[in-house]
């Protein structure tokens, strides 16, 4: 989320008191930390990627296969942001405006899913198209929730910055008014 959360707590020790052997190298190193996956942002990104994948599979099996590109792209983008947030790439790559990219991704995904879901349900009669439309509506809700939360976090962050600027400007104004009264 924005501003970036501090480092998540490491996984707690097992009940036995000590860890059994060294960490397993390989693919497990690529998996996001459990603390991130249990956070609200992690859950939203998991839901976005899961619903996008299910919607993609439904569109592949349906007669509305013209719509399969949008869920595939959203699935890949959700996976990218999942791993980027989990690996804290937003801290490493400061040149990119991560909250704005995530916000725009969620807004466009919600709008596109809403439009293609309405079309899939209204225009096509097969069951896979109807299922894709229903999963698309669920994905619309998840993406809309995500962009609402991102917007609130960014607005809160900007409001904190504005209040600090106002305080500095107010102090400067008081100092200037004190010097004029002498």
From Swiss-Prot:
Belongs to the chemokine-like factor family. Pfam families: MARVEL. GO terms for cellular component: cytoplasmic vesicle; cytosol; extracellular space; membrane; nuclear membrane. Residues 1-12 have a biased composition (Acidic residues). GO terms for biological process: blastocyst hatching; chemotaxis; positive regulation of B cell receptor signaling pathway. GO terms for molecular function: cytokine activity. Residues 36-155 form the MARVEL domain. The gene is CMTM3. The chain crosses the membrane at residues 64-84, 101-121, 131-151. Keywords: Chemotaxis, Cytokine, Membrane, Transmembrane, Transmembrane helix. Residues 1-21 are annotated as: Disordered. Its main location: membrane. Expressed in the leukocytes, placenta and testis. PROSITE patterns: MARVEL. This is CKLF-like MARVEL transmembrane domain-containing protein 3. It is found in: Membrane. It is a multi-pass membrane protein. The keyword Magnesium does not apply.
